[in-house]
Regions:
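Short beta-strand/loop motif that positions the catalytic acidic residue
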Residues: 225, 231-233, 237
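Acidic catalytic loop of the alpha/beta-hydrolase fold
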Residues: 236-240, 269-270
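Flexible "cap/lid" loop of the alpha/beta hydrolase fold
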Residues: 151-154, 158, 167-194
Length: 291
């Protein structure tokens, strides 16, 4: 006898299929050392994958380019990994002007995937040892912070102004309470359910739910930022409010030598691929600013 599947079971199965597909998609942002190095090798580039220990966590980063040039460190958003920046890392224009670095933020990629670090300050302190090492080789350092990477870049500049000479903020999640929360994030907050979701999404959700508190704690640091800033965001950003966040940045960055705000018509939150050329252009401009 044929039985109808109860609606809640059907919806559960459908949800699981969707989540599995999302998980498969997200894994393209987390590639092994071998796969990452192969990507660059096929382009005739000699990249390096390295690890260091910070606060008991092994942190992975990639580097490529000439030590005699200035440096750019790319800090990704959520959910993601350093592999989201592969195209930028392989860009011939950027490599002509700088040695390029990209990091797996704590909780992502191969920096303890699934083990969340929701504190912006702790993430900043875990990245600082890499910047200290970069500073030994490079006189100038520009940091690119995309989405959730934006406030981490700001916190690093507040904690260690000697380690950053310029910042590019891409669709930065910096204004408390000005981010979108999606329905799918709610079940990921339930301990018994979170284990069925991709670890990358769970970490992103943990960060999201702590973000307002963390951004409020960051508020006193903004006035201490004294490096040039380039701010880029899409006018159709569906995650970070494009109407209020640029004004927040302008009001808080009161002591920077320069602040350029670029709003892109018809552009949504995700910038790294669709705005590749603009990011390259503005990173090169920032390098010239800080020379």
């Amino acid at each position: 006898m044929k039985k109808n599947i109860p609606p809640f079971i059907f919806l559960s199965i459908l949800t699981w299929i969707c989540i599995s597909n999302i998980g498969c998609y997200m894994t393209t942002f987390r590639r092994s050392d071998h796969a990452t190095l192969t990507y660059f090798r096929e382009k005739g580039l000699d990249a390096t994958i390295s690890y260091y220990m910070s606060e008991g966590r092994k942190i992975r980063y990639a580097s490529i380019g000439n030590d005699s040039l200035p440096a750019i460190l790319m800090i990704h958003g959520a959910p993601s990994s350093l592999n989201i920046n592969q195209r930028l890392l392989a860009d011939s224009v950027l490599l002509h002007h700088a040695k390029l670095y990209a990091i797996d933020r704590p909780g992502y990629g191969y920096s303890g995937l699934g083990h969340s670090v929701t504190s912006i300050e702790r993430q900043a302190r875990m990245i600082i040892p890499l910047l200290e090492n970069i500073r030994k080789r490079h006189k100038k350092i520009v940091v690119e912070g995309i989405s959730f990477g934006g406030p981490i870049a700001i916190k690093i500049a507040a904690l260690r102004p000697d380690l950053i000479d310029g910042i590019l903020l891409g669709a930065p999640a910096i204004a408390p309470g000005q981010e979108t929360y999606f329905d799918i994030s709610y079940p990921m907050r339930v301990p018994i359910l979170k284990y069925i979701f991709p670890r990358m999404l769970v970490v992103a959700t943990d960060e999201k739910w702590a973000h307002r508190r963390e951004l409020e704690a960051l508020l006193p640091d903004w006035a201490s930022i004294r490096v040039p800033i380039i701010y880029i965001q899409g006018e159709n950003d569906e995650i970070v409010n494009p109407k209020t966040t640029p004004a927040f940045a302008s009001a808080r960055l009161i002591n920077v030598p320069s602040l350029e705000i670029i709003m892109i018509p018809n552009q949504r939150h995700f910038l790294t691929y669709p705005q590749h050329k603009l990011l390259v252009t503005k990173l090169v401009e920032m390098l010239k600013k800080v020379q």
